[in-house]
Amino acid sequence: MQNATTGFVGGWTAKAIADAGHSVRFLVRNPARLKTSVAKLGVDVSDFAVADISDRDSVREALNGCDAVVHSAALVATDPRETSRMLSTNMAGAQNVLGQAVELGMDPIVHVSSFTALFRPNLATLSADLPVAGGTDGYGQSKAQIEIYARGLQDAGAPVNITYPGMVLGPPVGDQFGEAGEGVRSALWMHVIPGRGAAWLIVDVRDVAALHAALLESGRGPRRYTAGGHRIPVPELAKILGEVAGTTMLAVPVPDSALRVAGSVLDQAGPYLPFNTPFTAAGMQYYTQMPESDDSPSEKELGITYRDPRDTVADTVTALRGLGS
């Protein structure tokens, strides 16, 4: 059973799982969205269960008859006023999906976390066995809380497998590009990449999906893997975007501290602005202090190959233009 399959990472993960010969049951709130998302990748979406991850009984019914589960569904809210609801909804979802999967003896149980659960300022390199930290924003806090819960299941011996993707880019699922894809769209619109020590941590959605499919092997016990991808500093990022998009992109050495201040100010002003802005306090915290990612364990143990970020960015830009963005 898999949830979040109408989204970007979830849709590509479902395709990788199906391509590996597994049958997928889709947990969805609106089954009509399957046809406009993951089905566009050529995946059979006939087996689905209609449920919300916050509904314990309906989740359990969806889990019955399945051998394994991939859980990546989560409420994402950038408005600080929504933090409390996000924390409670996402924790309930983790308990209902991961917790009940453990009760039912499912193996493996894959939980898709985020590099933000491990992030802290001045961290040089991400690795899967770092202690839980999480950003200061609501989303980072939510990921950290669920991470603590999932690791508790691991400590008890449950076959929970946790992954930590970076900024996921690549071709869309229907019209879903994910948050990092929206970052590409914004950068191309502005023609400017600001920052001095800032960077993106780019991983291809197809490589993340391949990792999730590779984890669907029973009897391996609890495991954790980063899938951060490649750290691309501002000058290189501007060069790649400019070349693949055939446009002028400028790397502007704005002090990183100024970007963090701007993010905080725009968080406060956001509700009163007539437009959406990619600058948030949390986003600037991650962007200006982005670490490297040690993905060698998944490369060595699971045979995952992380493709050239230039190819990933090029595929993203091509697809954005194909949709008229």
PLM-predicted stretches and their roles:
Residues 1-22:
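N-terminal Rossmann NAD(P)H-binding glycine-rich loop of SDR-like oxidoreductase domains
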Residues 160-162, 166-200:
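NAD(P)-dependent short-chain dehydrogenase/reductase
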